[in-house]
Amino acid sequence: EEHYPLKDMNINALCETIMEKAKTNFKPEVEAVLNVPRVNIKTNAEALERILLYLLRNAALHTDNGKITLEFKKRSAHTGQFIITDTGTGIPTEIKGKLFKPFAEIHDLTQGNGLGLPTCSLIAYKLNGTLHLDNEYKKGTRFVLELHDK
């Protein structure tokens, strides 16, 4: 199927649930920060949860202290961004270009089968969106999931 069915939903409640699930993987010194307004967007809850949970759990693997943040910013009438930021070790430059390639041999960065980020990227596409690494961010790692509800 090309795209997921989208439905209008309150993302604040959804993100609270996702963060609660992800927090079970956080180290004790890591603070979970949720900054998501009470707005509705058209999305697919299950698909969105798969991406955000993966990114938050991956952040948890590489963050020993500080915080992991999940926020949402409305960029325009039909565009919003979910931003996942951590204060972890960051991603080595030589690996950044391979992150979204299936089976890139970066086992220290992803859990399990190496399919994580490429799969998340495909799910993002099916949600009318894109997933990318913010290369400008230097205090850890920041991923941006941009969704269009058109």
Spans of features found by a protein language model:
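Short beta-strand/loop element within the Bergerat-fold HATPase_c
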Residues: 67-78
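Short conserved segment of the HATPase_c
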Residues: 91-103
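Detector for a conserved hydrophobic position within an alpha-helical segment of the HATPase_c
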Residues: 123-124
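Acidic ATP/Mg2+-coordinating residue in the GHKL
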Residues: 86
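Conserved micro-motifs of the catalytic ATP-binding
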Residues: 1-4, 40-43
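Short helix-loop "hinge" at the ATP-lid/N-box region of the Bergerat-fold HATPase_c
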Residues: 58-60
